[in-house]
């Protein structure tokens, strides 16, 4: 027994714990250095997993210690066990395993320094498990992906973490969430709404805050839309094109629908069709809408019923850039001499780039074909004028080749 007691400290001191001790020292230094790091997002929710990495390291090296001690002492014990009162190999193993389980994490600091030249067998090297330290603070979620199953599953869904990490609050939110408890139920809810698998990633990249919403509140908002006779297909389309729609309360959604119905003097069906085609009318600011309504009426001279007709056909006119609207109207009305009543029939003019309208009109004027009055021969439809690609425009309307059109553009 005395012989074993003398051998045990020497064997224990020879265990190669260098890597583990270094890992623990690095962890301590990281904790101190974290105070000096610029404000990013913290990994506090994941620190418990870091501790488990540390304990697995202890277990690995304890196992190596036992393997070494067992192989070195077995031969000696066989020759002396019969003539002495030393315990058997099985008893030694039981005691060593007991020692392994009783070694606390705090006693690692008290271990004596080990020689860096001490060799490790190939079998022991294979058993060494290396775990990268978890950063205390970081400016990128990429540092936490290997440690977080939640982030890994979000990446698999197609979520762009590089966009979310620009918002520290959102990044911290994701680090605190558990996929099974908090995220899975939201994904199933979105799937029930009609979103496809390839649509979940882009949706969650834009509206990551939906994970902080109460599921019952989300269901209540969907039920409200259904009560307004929005079909399941309509709701899926609206949620896809306006990801923040479900983050709006029922009261706010009701106020927005009421605003457009009153402002444009639309019936319920036309109001519903309007927001289905452009659902961001319900989520965006109302100031551009109010401003454009004034521009159409006061600056461009359209009547209320004319504005209503154009907006129903091209909902984007409500949120278009004011400067673009005035430039297009000025050129179409004052240069091309197209009156209001014809513009009202072709509101897609306001959804076209100004330079495209100029190029095509000048080319038709050069050829003597710039005739936009439907009551006269050789009439050019403004719908085809703006919608046809260059090749078809040249063939069907200008009656010229694409090469001639490209040469003409070089003269402008």
From Swiss-Prot:
GO (cellular component) term, any one: cytosol
GO aspect biological process, one term: negative regulation of DNA-templated transcription
Knocked-out gene: effects: Embryonic lethality, due to severe mitochondrial dysfunction. Embryos are much smaller than normal and none survive past 10.5 dpc.
Gene Ontology MF term list: transcription cis-regulatory region binding
Location in the cell: Mitochondrion
Domain of life assignment: Eukaryota
Primary localization: mitochondrion
Similarity-based family: Belongs to the mTERF family.
Domain text: Contains seven structural repeats of about 35 residues, where each repeat contains three helices. The repeats form a superhelical structure with a solenoid shape.
Descriptive protein name: Transcription termination factor 3, mitochondrial
Originating gene: Mterf3
């Amino acid at each position: 027994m005395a012989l074993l007691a003398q051998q045990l400290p020497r064997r224990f001191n020879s265990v190669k714990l260098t890597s583990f001790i270094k890992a623990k020292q690095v962890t301590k230094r990281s904790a101190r250095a974290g105070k000096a790091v610029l404000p990013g997002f913290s990994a506090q929710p994941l620190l418990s997993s870091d501790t488990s990495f540390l304990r697995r390291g202890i277990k690995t090296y304890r196992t190596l210690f036992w393997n070494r001690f067992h192989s070195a002492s077995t031969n000696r014990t066989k020759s002396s066990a019969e003539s002495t009162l030393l315990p058997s190999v099985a008893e030694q193993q039981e005691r060593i395993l007991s020692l392994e389980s009783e070694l606390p994490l705090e006693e690692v600091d008290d271990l004596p320094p080990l020689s860096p030249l001490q060799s490790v067998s190939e079998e022991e090297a294979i058993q060494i498990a290396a775990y990268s330290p978890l950063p205390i603070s970081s400016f990128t979620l990429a540092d936490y992906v290997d440690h977080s199953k939640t982030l890994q599953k979000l990446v698999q869904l197609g979520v762009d973490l590089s966009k979310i990490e620009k918002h520290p609050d959102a990044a911290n939110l994701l680090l605190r969430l558990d996929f099974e408890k908090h995220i899975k139920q939201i994904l199933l809810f979105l799937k029930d709404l009609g979103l496809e698998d390839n649509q979940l990633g882009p949706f969650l990249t834009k509206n990551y805050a939906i994970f902080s919403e109460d599921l019952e509140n989300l269901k209540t908002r969907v039920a409200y839309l259904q009560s307004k006779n929005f079909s399941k297909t309509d709701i899926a389309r609206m949620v896809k094109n306006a990801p923040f729609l479900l983050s709006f309360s029922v009261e706010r959604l009701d106020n927005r629908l009421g605003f457009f119905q009153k402002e444009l003097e639309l019936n319920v069906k036309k109001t519903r069709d309007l927001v289905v085609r452009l659902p961001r009318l319900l989520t965006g600011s109302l100031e551009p809408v109010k401003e454009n309504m004034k521009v159409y009426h006061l600056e461009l001279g359209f009547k209320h019923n004319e504005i209503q007709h154009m907006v129903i056909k091209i909902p984007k006119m409500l949120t278009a850039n004011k400067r673009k609207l005035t430039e297009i109207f000025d050129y179409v009305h004052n240069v091309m001499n197209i009156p209001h009543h014809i513009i009202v029939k072709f509101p897609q003019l306001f959804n076209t780039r100004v330079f495209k309208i100029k190029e095509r009109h000048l080319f038709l004027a050069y050829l003597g074909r710039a005739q936009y009055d439907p009551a006269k021969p050789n009439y050019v439809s403004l719908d085809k004028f703006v919608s046809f690609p260059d090749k078809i425009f040249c063939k069907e309307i200008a009656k010229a080749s694409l090469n001639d059109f490209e040469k003409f553009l070089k003269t402008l």
